[in-house]
């Protein structure tokens, strides 16, 4: 790119400069020259600090590599290892007890436990669907997934199957019995709903009525009191809307005329600029920034074709009901948010992007760019009116930013300093920008309490990320010896300690009722029955939120937060610390290399297939998050985190002679044919197997494995970005 706009010491891509000046700045009351001058100063002051932190990562890794190489034969004592990490500053002293002081945070984060979506910001349709997933039909979620079995003639089919529909209704009634029980009997027995002297009354077959076991769970309704069209209930802070219409197709089959049960579902959503997107240049970044602007202004729209019809999808409005009881101010209406509360995930400290270069042509850190531009855009989510759009995101004046891939408290402190400088540029009060800390790197896990302390007045979220965290676990100890197989990682000692410690330190530092404690993604997008059975373990473990791959999954996962009162779990866990540093330092090394040749081949093939299936869409289609069938054709929601663990495991096995370079190359060639076949129905797919040497995607996958041990902290972004740019240049893709 040769044509750039000069801004002080910076050279800005015209597509970005024009977007900021013509679209993002109007409505913020910020002068363009003042803004760009501030950008120039922040970049000049903080880029060297960013580079120093990355150099510190490399230095620590080099010291750890040397330490392990000196002991790879004789092994080492855990206490010696722990002392070494302390001596080099990798393991830092834990601070004295404290509580976070974050203020001005929305209820969705502080006092509401529920599902969290993560979606790629480059896809406007996905972003709209996620923002609108605050409310979801339980009937649809059940009918369209394997939560309802096909047994007894209940197959989904192409048209409505009343046998399946009856199963859905029965399941929903059982859910209501658990979440909002009647004073006696079952929701399955009712024939109607009405108000009786301001209280909800359910009519029964014999003409009698029964109220709720806890009358306060009734909070609002729509329509006439004698024949409401909707009834609003609440349990554990989450709302349930029962829709009534005896003439609707489903309501007509229900003796109570109930046509649907709608659950408050995706309470919060992360709009992602990081692991789920392929944004490698100025054009990609501006596409994401423009979608983020539309979400904050409330005017994002997308043409959608469904069932042979085309319509425009927009953001949902808030929902207003007649209140069951007048509010403190005498208000007779109850208004609830119609949309998920939005976070934005910036990129980490590692990557740069050519959207802005300095006077010498060096790309500037992408994380600094994201902080400046996503925060500027976030101002629109704090206001309504001319220039800001009709909707707000935060009702408390905060902009929520998830910051990933931070290594230790110094990097968290740097993020907070960056946010403070951005607030100065934007004229925002200090601590407007809140931070979500991803606990997904080993040095952050080991120093989690110190990381939280570094952001004590900004932090609104800590979250475990098993895949990235495992990738860093492997890379940090790359030279210690061969690691166990990928599937065995979830049952290791350090993983259990990691998941428990995150909750315990969150509670210890005052997160309950003030900030989110989150847990990771359910990746098997089509296996919703398994999710409903298993994912309840996360709220039971104290998580106030956990990641889901779709709006449907959000609605199903919401049921878990009705069954589990997470804040009661917090009271039970308070004062405990279940994970120890010694457990966290237990490296997942294979005790002995007792794998049979076919087991090794299976592991290599599984990982190579996973890598190719993800990378080919990343490189050729610019898709950073998608359902990728595994070697057994089970659809998995994959992003860069899954790629990191797979490539790092194979790099580790290569390092220690478990496999050879030729084993990897042969597996990649075999698996390329498998991935080609899995994508055969896609007319735009470019097969890899016929010419692997000519496939940039294939070469990228191979490089990720063969060069995996040399990648900074095992990250995949440097290779992916370079190869995607190569593909775009070769294909004239904009």
UniProtKB/Swiss-Prot annotation:
Active site, UniProt feature: 345, 639
Catalytic activity as recorded in UniProt: glyoxylate + acetyl-CoA + H2O = (S)-malate + CoA + H(+)
Cellular component terms per the entry's GO annotation: cytosol
Pathway: Carbohydrate metabolism; glyoxylate cycle; (S)-malate from isocitrate: step 2/2
Location in the cell: Cytoplasm
CDD domains the UniProt entry points to: malate_synt_G (cd00728)
Role summary: Involved in the glycolate utilization. Catalyzes the condensation and subsequent hydrolysis of acetyl-coenzyme A (acetyl-CoA) and glyoxylate to form malate and CoA.
EC nos: 2.3.3.9
Keywords carried by this UniProt record: Cytoplasm, Glyoxylate bypass, Magnesium, Metal-binding, Oxidation, Transferase, Tricarboxylic acid cycle
Pfam families: MS_C, MS_N, MS_TIM-barrel, MSG_insertion
GO BP term, pick one: glyoxylate cycle
Binding site for acetyl-CoA: 118, 125-126, 276, 313, 549
Domain of life from the UniProt record: Bacteria
Family affiliation: Belongs to the malate synthase family. GlcB subfamily.
Modified residues (Cysteine sulfenic acid (-SOH)): 625
Ligand binding (glyoxylate): 345, 440, 465-468
MF terms (GO), sorted A to Z: magnesium ion binding; malate synthase activity
Originating organism: Mycolicibacterium vanbaalenii (strain DSM 7251 / JCM 13017 / BCRC 16820 / KCTC 9966 / NRRL B-24157 / PYR-1)
Binding site for Mg(2+): 440, 468
InterPro entries: Malate_synth_C_sf, Malate_synth_sf, Malate_synthase_TIM, Malate_synthG, MS_C, MS_N, MS_N_TIM-barrel_dom, MSG_insertion
Entry protein name: Malate synthase G
Lineage: Bacteria, Bacillati, Actinomycetota, Actinomycetes, Mycobacteriales
Subunit (UniProt): Monomer.
């Amino acid at each position: 790119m040769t044509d750039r706009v000069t801004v002080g010491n910076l050279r800005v891509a015209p597509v970005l400069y024009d977007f900021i000046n013509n679209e993002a700045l109007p409505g913020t009351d910020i002068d363009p020259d003042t803004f760009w001058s501030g950008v120039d100063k922040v970049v000049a002051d903080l880029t060297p600090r960013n580079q120093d932190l990355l150099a510190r990562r490399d230095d620590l890794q080099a010291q750890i590599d040397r330490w392990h190489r000196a002991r790879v034969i004789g092994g080492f004592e855990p206490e010696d290892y722990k002392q070494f990490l302390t001596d080099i500053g990798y393991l830092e002293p834990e601070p004295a007890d404290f509580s976070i002081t974050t203020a001005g945070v929305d209820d969705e984060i502080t006092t509401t436990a529920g599902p969290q979506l993560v979606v790629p910001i480059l896809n406007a349709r996905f972003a709209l669907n996620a923002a609108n997933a605050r409310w979801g039909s339980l009937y649809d979620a059940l009918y369209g997934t394997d939560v309802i079995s096909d047994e007894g003639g209940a197959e989904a089919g192409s048209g409505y199957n009343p046998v399946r529909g009856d199963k859905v209704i029965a399941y929903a009634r059982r859910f209501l019995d658990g979440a909002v029980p009647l004073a006696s009997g079952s929701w399955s027995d009712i024939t109607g709903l009405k108000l009786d002297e301001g209280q909800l009354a359910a009519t029964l077959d014999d003409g009698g009525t029964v109220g709720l076991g806890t009358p306060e769970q009734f909070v609002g309704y729509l329509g006439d009191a004698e024949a409401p069209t909707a009834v609003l209930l609440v349990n554990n802070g989450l709302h349930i809307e029962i829709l009534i219409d005896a003439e609707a197709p489903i309501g007509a089959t229900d003796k109570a005329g109930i046509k649907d049960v709608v659950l408050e579902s995706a309470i919060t959503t992360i709009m992602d600029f990081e692991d789920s997107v392929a944004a490698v240049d100025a054009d990609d970044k501006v596409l994401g920034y423009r979608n983020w602007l539309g979400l904050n202004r409330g005017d994002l729209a997308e043409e959608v074709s469904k069932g042979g019809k085309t319509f425009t999808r927009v953001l949902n409005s808030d929902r207003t009901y007649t209140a069951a009881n007048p509010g403190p101010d005498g208000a007779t209406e109850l208004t609830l948010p119609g949309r998920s509360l939005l976070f934005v995930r910036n990129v980490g400290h590692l990557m740069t992007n050519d959207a802005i270069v300095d006077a010498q042509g060096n790309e500037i850190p992408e994380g600094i760019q994201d902080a400046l531009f996503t925060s500027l855009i976030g101002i629109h989510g704090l206001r309504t009116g001319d220039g800001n759009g009709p909707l707000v995101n935060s009702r408390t004046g905060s902009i929520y930013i998830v910051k990933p891939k931070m290594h230790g408290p110094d990097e968290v402190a740097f993020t907070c300093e960056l946010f403070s400088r951005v607030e100065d540029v934007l004229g925002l009060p200090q601590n407007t920008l809140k931070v979500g800390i991803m606990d997904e790197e080993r040095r952050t896990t080991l120093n989690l309490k110190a990381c939280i302390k570094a952001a004590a007045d900004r932090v609104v979220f800590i979250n475990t990320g098993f895949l990235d965290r495992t990738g860093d676990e492997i890379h940090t100890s790359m030279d210690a010896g061969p690691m166990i197989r990928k599937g065995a990682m979830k049952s290791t000692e350090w993983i259990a300690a990691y998941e428990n410690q995150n909750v315990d330190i969150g509670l210890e530092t005052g997160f309950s009722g003030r900030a989110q404690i989150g847990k990771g993604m359910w990746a098997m997008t089509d296996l919703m029955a398994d999710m409903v059975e298993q994912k309840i373990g996360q709220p039971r473990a104290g998580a106030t939120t956990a990641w889901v791959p779709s709006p449907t999954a959000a609605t199903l996962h919401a049921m878990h937060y009705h069954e589990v009162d997470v804040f009661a779990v917090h009271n039970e866990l308070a004062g405990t610390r279940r994970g120890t540093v010694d457990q966290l330092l237990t490296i997942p090394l294979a005790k002995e290399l007792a794998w049979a040749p076919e087991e090794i081949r299976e592991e290599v093939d599984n990982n190579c297939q996973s890598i190719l299936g993800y990378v080919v869409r990343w490189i050729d289609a610019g898709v950073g998050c998608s359902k990728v069938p595994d070697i057994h054709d089970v659809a998995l929601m994959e992003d860069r985190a899954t790629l990191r663990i797979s490539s790092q495991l194979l790099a580790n096995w290569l390092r220690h002679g478990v496999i050879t370079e030729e084993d990897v190359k042969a597996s990649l060639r075999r698996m390329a044919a498998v991935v080609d076949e899995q994508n055969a129905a896609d007319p735009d797919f470019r097969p890899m197997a016929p010419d692997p040497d000519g496939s940039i995607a294939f070469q990228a996958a191979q490089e990720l494995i063969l060069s995996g041990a040399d990648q900074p902290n095992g990250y995949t972004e440097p290779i992916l970005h370079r190869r995607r740019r190569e593909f775009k240049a070769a294909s004239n893709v904009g």
